[in-house]
A protein has these predicted regions:
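Active-site loop-to-helix "anion-binding N-cap" substructures in soluble metabolic enzymes
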Residues: 1-161, 166-261
């Protein structure tokens, strides 16, 4: 199965001209990169149409957020139907920056996941601990509790059917303390947390779901560490943040992944 490369542009770039220049970098490494990986781009909503027009290869279009209702007056929000009409397939849900800066609650995250599933959109749920757990390969109680609580709230009232070649959602393990800091989680420690998430999934949804649901790593992914994370059989891909809109770093990532070295 192909691994996932998810590129979260956040609030970048600053204008459409810069966006087109950035998308040329992605196009320049296709189809090599899309033959090896499932590649999804998550530009700001204002750039979704322009991104769709400028992406000719098999790139997947994603959005950074969604509102949880289709038919309600909510100024400034984007509904699932709107995103569907633009060809969006993936939606990032519960990113720590939204939890922190916009006070997005666990209840809202649960509503958004349900809205995605009800509208044939794939939610990409982000979970992770606030503080660096330095206890080694066995996550400490605080970390376990924090991640289990996020999962319990996110999947409240949600049923997932046994997969027929895959599932219609994915999870990103993103240690909050590593986001944007230039320091990623240790690979073995990341694998331990991902194993913990799979354990929770097996208890909640069964072994088949736990085995097939994609779990990715996110948090200061760059050209120096991306191959290490992708080499792990326990990690199904990566969510790339700051490096997504740095053309030099992006080129280094693609060179790492498209050359045999």
């Amino acid at each position: 199965m192909k691994k996932y490369l998810l590129f979260n542009f956040k609030t970048n770039p600053s204008n459409v001209i810069q966006l087109k220049q950035l998308l040329k970098v992605f196009q320049g490494y296709s189809p090599k990169i899309t033959e090896k990986f499932k590649v999804a781009l998550f530009p700001p909503d204002i750039y979704l149409i322009e991104s769709k027009k400028n992406l000719k290869a098999k790139f997947i279009l994603g959005a950074q957020d969604v509102f949880w209702f289709n038919k309600i007056q909510a100024t400034g929000e984007i509904t699932p139907l709107m995103l569907n009409s633009l060809g969006v397939q993936y939606i990032i849900i519960g990113h720590s920056e939204r939890r922190r800066y916009l006070e997005e609650t666990d209840e809202m995250i649960n509503w958004k996941i349900k809205a995605c599933l009800n509208n044939k959109l794939t939610p990409v749920l982000c979970v992770g601990e606030q503080e660096n757990d330095k206890s080694g390969l066995i996550p400490n109680f605080r970390t376990k509790q924090e991640i289990f609580e996020q999962l319990n709230y996110a999947f409240r009232g949600i049923k997932i059917n046994p997969p027929a070649g895959g599932t219609n959602l994915m999870i990103v393990y993103e240690p909050v303390w590593a986001i944007g800091k230039g320091v990623s989680q240790d690979l073995k420690a990341s694998q331990a947390i991902i194993a913990l998430i799979r354990f929770w999934l097996s208890r909640r949804f069964g072994e088949a779901i736990a085995k097939h649901l994609p779990i990715l790593y996110g948090g200061s992914v760059n050209h120096q560490n991306i191959k290490e994370f992708l080499s792990s059989k326990d990690i199904n891909g990566v969510l790339i943040g700051s490096a997504s809109t740095n053309k030099i770093e992006l080129s280094k990532i693609f060179k790492q992944l498209t050359t045999n070295n």
